[in-house]
């Protein structure tokens, strides 16, 4: 894989005399990319938010240690990575049997759009930025031990040289290279063998049409039509709720057992998370006289079929910028 590229950073030499407002202004330029970095490390939007705040606090307190030997951006990444490792050392959750990552949270595309633009003339760079934020990648990377995880993200996603990663982690270059090989092997174990099976399709006309048909069938509660869009080995999960369903029959049986066909009136709003198509569903509530948030389905589409559905609970709607309610436009 190639690595993400970033625009050149204006020189920052001496932070000792910088006041807090000026320092905050410098740091805030990098907030979104640091947040995405912490999100890759932790798999949780909320934990990433807390860790970025901790990063800025540590950076302000240690500003006199910045000697200008690296860029200010690299210095912040160093602090952020160590803050993530500290958090994981305190309370590292273990993926459940079968590969579930119950703390996984979605990342809104509207916030990913705030990232500095990767080189449009470098297709591999653009692909890395997209693929390494998709949910399948996030789930796989959470299975790695924290330090190999950090090495993988710094080397393969951000493109840091092994020497700089070694300095950040206080390891030798040989140790970093060994950790990278272990991390890559772990990713191969937890990702499908074929790259297109875990990256999904680009959002092309065929994918958009499939998502539209999925949305229509879900609103109609047409289980047969939904089943026809699933690949035989489809995976379905709903973090943080336990339970990973694998295979079309298992997924459909779970829908039926959960009473999907007897739900009340539904409405849907298209959205996007983690550079994947998603659909937000709303359920009619008589007591409120409106459609209220139900779930968000993030879809992975490969070869014209749905290969994974990750369903998130209604508490994610505000972060995704989705409406709190939808008005009645017909008699439910």
What is each PLM-predicted segment?
Residues 13-36, 46-49, 60:
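A short, charge-rich alpha-helical start-of-domain segment used by transcription regulators
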Residues 17, 41-45, 54-72, 86-94, ...:
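Sigma70-family region 2
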Residues 34, 38, 76, 80-88:
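Hydrophobic-face residues of short alpha-helical interaction/recognition segments
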Residues 35, 45-62, 77, 158:
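Conserved RNAP core-binding helix
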Residues 88-109, 191-199:
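Short, basic/polar amphipathic helix motif occurring as a linker/hinge flanking DNA-binding modules
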Residues 151-152:
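A short pre-motif secondary-structure segment
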Residues 162-168, 173-267:
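Solvent-exposed, charged amphipathic helical/linker segments at domain boundaries
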Residues 252-332:
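Low-complexity, glycine/alanine/valine/leucine- and proline-rich hydrophobic stretches
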């Amino acid at each position: 894989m190639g690595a993400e590229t970033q625009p050149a950073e204006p020189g920052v030499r001496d932070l000792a005399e910088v006041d807090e407002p000026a320092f905050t202004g410098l740091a805030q330029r990098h907030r979104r990319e640091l947040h995405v970095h912490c999100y890759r490390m932790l798999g949780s939007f909320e934990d990433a938010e807390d860790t970025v705040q901790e990063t800025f606090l540590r950076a302000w307190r240690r500003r006199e240690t910045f000697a200008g030997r690296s860029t200010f951006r690299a210095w912040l990444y160093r602090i952020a990575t160590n803050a993530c490792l500290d958090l994981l050392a305190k309370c590292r959750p273990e993926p459940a049997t079968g590969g579930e990552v119950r703390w996984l949270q979605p990342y809104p595309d509207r916030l990913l759009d705030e990232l500095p633009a990767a080189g449009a003339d470098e297709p591999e760079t653009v692909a890395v930025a997209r693929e390494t934020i998709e949910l399948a990648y996030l789930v796989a990377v959470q299975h790695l031990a924290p330090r190999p995880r950090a090495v993988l993200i710094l080397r393969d996603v951000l493109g840091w040289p092994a020497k700089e990663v070694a300095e950040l982690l206080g390891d030798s270059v040989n140790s970093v290279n060994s950790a990278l090989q272990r991390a890559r092997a772990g990713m191969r174990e937890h990702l499908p063998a074929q790259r297109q099976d875990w990256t999904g399709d680009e959002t092309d006309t065929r994918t958009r049409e499939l998502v539209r048909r999925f949305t229509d069938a879900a609103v109609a509660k047409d289980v047969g039509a939904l089943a026809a869009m699933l690949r035989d080995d489809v995976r379905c999960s709903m973090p943080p709720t336990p339970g990973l369903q694998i295979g079309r029959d298992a997924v459909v049986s779970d829908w039926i057992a959960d009473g999907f066909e007897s739900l009340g009136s539904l409405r849907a709003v298209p959205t996007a998370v983690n550079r994947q198509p998603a659909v937000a569903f709303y359920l009619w509530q008589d007591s409120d006289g409106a459609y209220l948030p139900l779930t968000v389905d993030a879809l992975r589409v490969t070869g014209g079929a749905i290969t994974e559905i990750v369903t998130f609970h209604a508490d994610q709607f505000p972060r995704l910028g989705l409406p709190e309610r939808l008005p009645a436009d017909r008699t439910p």
